[in-house]
Amino acid sequence: EQQLVRNLAVEWGPHNIRVNAIAPGLIKTDFARELWEDPQKTKAVERITPLGRLGDPDDIGMLTASLATRAGNYLTGQTITIDGGRMITDPS
C-alpha cells in the first residue's frame, strides 16, 4: 500500500489532492473481538506494545479527523501506522 499511496500522491498532488493511508494495529473492533475479549491474549499484546494498551476506534477516528483539517494540509504520500508503537518492537 505504501507505494500506491506515494504514486497517487505524485499523480494527484498537482490537482491539490492529498493522498494518505492509515495502517491500524490491533484496534478494539468486532474484527478483533476474539483477541480483546480474552484477558490472557489482551495482556500478551499489551506487554509487547510500547503504549501498553490496545487501540480504540477513537484513536483511528481522531487521526482521520486531523488529516481532514488544516493540520493535514501539507501531508501527502504517507502511510501512517497507528499501533501504539508495536511495529517498532516487532517490524515483521
What are these regions (language model features)?
Residues 35-49:
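A short C-terminal helix-loop "cap" of Rossmann-like NAD(P)-dependent dehydrogenase/epimerase domains
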Residues 65, 76-92:
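Short C-terminal tail/terminal secondary-structure segment
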Residues 10-14, 73:
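Alpha-helical segment proximal to the catalytic Tyr-Lys
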Residues 49-60, 71:
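A conserved structural motif in NAD(P)-dependent oxidoreductases
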Residues 15, 20, 78:
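Rossmann-like NAD(H)/NADP(H) cofactor-binding core
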Residues 23-34:
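Short, flexible catalytic-loop segment of classical short-chain dehydrogenase/reductase
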Residues 5-6, 61-64, 68:
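Short-chain dehydrogenase/reductase
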Residues 1-11:
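Conserved catalytic helix of short-chain dehydrogenase/reductases
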